[in-house]
Regions:
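Alpha-helical and His/Cys-centered functional microenvironments
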Residues: 6, 16-17, 53
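Bacterial N-terminal signal peptides that target proteins for export
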Residues: 14-29
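Classic N-terminal secretory signal peptides
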Residues: 32-33
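A generic "folded-domain core" signal
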Residues: 41-186
């Protein structure tokens, strides 16, 4: 029979931080599903957490959708309400979509603006629509995903509809394991 474990004050604080992270992720799941514009028959399920990246799945009309998602470690400028900010990479085998990176902001992006993602000095340009952004040149999606797997941190710069320049820093710890987890998504 397993022994009971007791949480120290630090463990309780870690648990509160984890619960806050899970609540933010739950919000992200709802946003991801809403952004697909597809009715679904099943709520998203968290498959597993890998450091700063979680792996998730849900059933959609076109089949199973799997994705990895993280929230930024740092947000700038500090004096503005950013809302819920996420970066995710989705895979939709039923629609022949593999590893599609997407930035989701908690605010509308400036029309016709670009979002710049930088990893280890390499820049990727994303086009915007509403509060989301996708890789401008789909042929660069695999290169962005490879850079994420090989990098330590990722910077995402955007401009809000109001003209506020924003910058987010994401940890890439766990991205490779999370992507490996959804590789078998069918």
């Amino acid at each position: 029979m397993p022994c009971p474990s007791f949480r120290s004050g630090t463990d309780q604080q870690d648990n509160r931080q984890e619960n806050m992270f899970v609540r933010k992720i739950a919000t992200a799941l709802a946003l991801v599903i809403a952004s697909t514009g597809v009715a679904f028959s099943q709520s998203p399920t968290r498959i597993q957490q890998f450091n700063d990246w979680g792996a998730y799945s849900y059933q959609a009309g076109g089949g199973k959708v799997c994705y990895v998602l993280s929230i930024p470690k740092e947000k700038a400028p500090s004096g503005v309400d950013h809302g819920d900010i996420f970066f995710l990479v989705s895979q939709r085998p039923g629609q022949n979509i593999s590893y599609e990176p997407q930035a989701m902001m908690g605010y509308p992006l400036q029309e016709n603006s670009k979002v710049n993602v930088t990893i280890d000095g390499r820049n990727f340009v994303l086009f915007t629509k509403g509060n989301s952004a996708w890789v401008e040149n789909a042929a660069e999606e695999p290169a962005l995903v490879a850079a994420m797997k090989g990098g330590k941190a990722m910077s995402v710069k955007a401009i809000s509809r109001r003209g506020t320049e924003t910058n987010y820093t994401y940890s890439l710890a766990g991205i490779t394991a999370a992507l490996n987890q959804i590789e078998t998504c069918k």
